[in-house]
């Protein structure tokens, strides 16, 4: 059984539990530095890492897919690379639906496979903290709803590394409405005045398939359930109930039956994400509808130019 992230991680100020775990955060940070290895660099393929500092729910996979779409439009042969995790088959399937995916327990092995297949660009979904690979382009993703939570590193908070490490990064991508991002952008610029900030929000691609007079029950096991529900409400769907499960949750028949029973109580149709739908492969999905979404990037031209220039570099 997979647990949800602790609620105190997303409090705006550290709680008693955060301070209680602070010594472990310090120890974990020291271990990470000690285990750091020389980074692998190569000239045979360009590497882009779409990663995060806040753990989970920042839109990495969606941005990786968007980058692949942009490269495809410009006739640049790109693939995806994702470290293999048995509990993240949903993301692996989603990436595979949108291009060639190389997945291995070691990212460097997957990268060498991509090189042998003649790809020009490798897009890493996650791996920002992988100390073995030197990326040509790194993009740090955040979600406006959670931002950095209580601002502390694991396990005291939700951060994989200190937020001040943004000083060493060149690119940030923010998920959310522009109005909600103003304060976050100001905080980022105070840390690194020269950092490039782009932003975007999720848009549903098949929203016209849904009757807006109908009741809907929403369920998901993704990093940021609230973002998904907010998107549906912004598109005028009548959400009467929503069920949140842990990220990458593997649904049992019992879970599935409970979802069906809850929907019947509200006389509601059932909606989930494409990721969750892919995890229901062994269950009867006839009563489940999924929303296919994409990222609408505020300055796609800027991102496109950056990607083209990257590929042109020797």
Curated annotation (Swiss-Prot):
<keyword id="KW-0418">Kinase</keyword>
<feature type="binding site">
    <location>
        <begin position="54"/>
        <end position="61"/>
    </location>
    <ligand>
        <name>ATP</name>
    </ligand>
</feature>
<comment type="pathway">
    <text>Glycolipid biosynthesis; lipid IV(A) biosynthesis; lipid IV(A) from (3R)-3-hydroxytetradecanoyl-[acyl-carrier-protein] and UDP-N-acetyl-alpha-D-glucosamine: step 6/6.</text>
</comment>
<keyword id="KW-0808">Transferase</keyword>
<dbReference type="GO" id="GO:0005886">
    <property type="term" value="C:plasma membrane"/>
</dbReference>
<dbReference type="InterPro" id="IPR003758">
    <property type="entry name" value="LpxK"/>
</dbReference>
<protein>
    <recommendedName>
        <fullName>Tetraacyldisaccharide 4'-kinase</fullName>
        <ecNumber>2.7.1.130</ecNumber>
    </recommendedName>
</protein>
<comment type="similarity">
    <text>Belongs to the LpxK family.</text>
</comment>
<dbReference type="GO" id="GO:0009244">
    <property type="term" value="P:lipopolysaccharide core region biosynthetic process"/>
</dbReference>
<dbReference type="GO" id="GO:0009029">
    <property type="term" value="F:tetraacyldisaccharide 4'-kinase activity"/>
</dbReference>
<keyword id="KW-0443">Lipid metabolism</keyword>
<keyword id="KW-0547">Nucleotide-binding</keyword>
<keyword id="KW-0444">Lipid biosynthesis</keyword>
<comment type="function">
    <text>Transfers the gamma-phosphate of ATP to the 4'-position of a tetraacyldisaccharide 1-phosphate intermediate (termed DS-1-P) to form tetraacyldisaccharide 1,4'-bis-phosphate (lipid IVA).</text>
</comment>
<keyword id="KW-0067">ATP-binding</keyword>
<keyword id="KW-0441">Lipid A biosynthesis</keyword>
<dbReference type="Pfam" id="PF02606">
    <property type="entry name" value="LpxK"/>
</dbReference>
<dbReference type="GO" id="GO:0005524">
    <property type="term" value="F:ATP binding"/>
</dbReference>
<dbReference type="GO" id="GO:0009245">
    <property type="term" value="P:lipid A biosynthetic process"/>
</dbReference>
């Amino acid at each position: 059984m997979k647990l949800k992230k602790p609620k105190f991680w997303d409090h705006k100020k550290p709680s008693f539990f955060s301070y209680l775990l602070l010594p472990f955060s310090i120890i974990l940070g020291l271990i990470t530095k000690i285990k750091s290895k020389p980074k692998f660099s190569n000239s045979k393929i360009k590497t882009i890492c779409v990663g995060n500092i806040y753990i989970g729910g920042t839109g990495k996979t969606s941005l990786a897919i968007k980058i692949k779409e942009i490269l495809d439009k410009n006739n640049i042969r790109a693939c995806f690379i994702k470290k293999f995790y048995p509990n993240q088959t949903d993301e692996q399937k989603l990436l595979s639906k949108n291009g060639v995916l190389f997945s291995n327990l070691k990212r460097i092995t997957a990268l060498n496979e991509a090189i042998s297949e003649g790809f020009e660009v490798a897009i890493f979904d996650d791996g920002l903290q992988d100390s073995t690979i030197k990326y040509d382009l790194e993009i740090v993703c955040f979600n406006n709803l959670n931002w950095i939570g209580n601002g502390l590193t694991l396990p005291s908070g939700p951060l994989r590394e200190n937020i001040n490490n943004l000083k060493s990064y060149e690119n940030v991508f923010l998920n959310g409405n522009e109005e909600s991002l103003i304060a976050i952008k100001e905080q980022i610029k105070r840390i690194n005045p020269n950092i490039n900030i782009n932003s975007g929000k999720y848009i549903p691609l098949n929203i016209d398939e849904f009757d807006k007079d109908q009741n809907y029950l929403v369920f998901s096991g993704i990093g940021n359930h609230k973002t998904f529900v907010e998107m549906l409400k912004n598109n005028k769907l009548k959400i009467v109930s929503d069920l949140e499960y842990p990220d990458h949750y593997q649904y049992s028949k019992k879970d599935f039956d409970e979802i069906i029973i809850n929907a019947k109580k509200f006389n509601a149709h059932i909606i989930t994400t494409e990721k969750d739908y892919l995890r229901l492969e062994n269950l009867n999905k006839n009563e489940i509808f999924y929303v296919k979404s994409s990222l609408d990037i505020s300055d796609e031209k800027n991102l496109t130019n950056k990607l083209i220039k990257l590929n042109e570099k020797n």
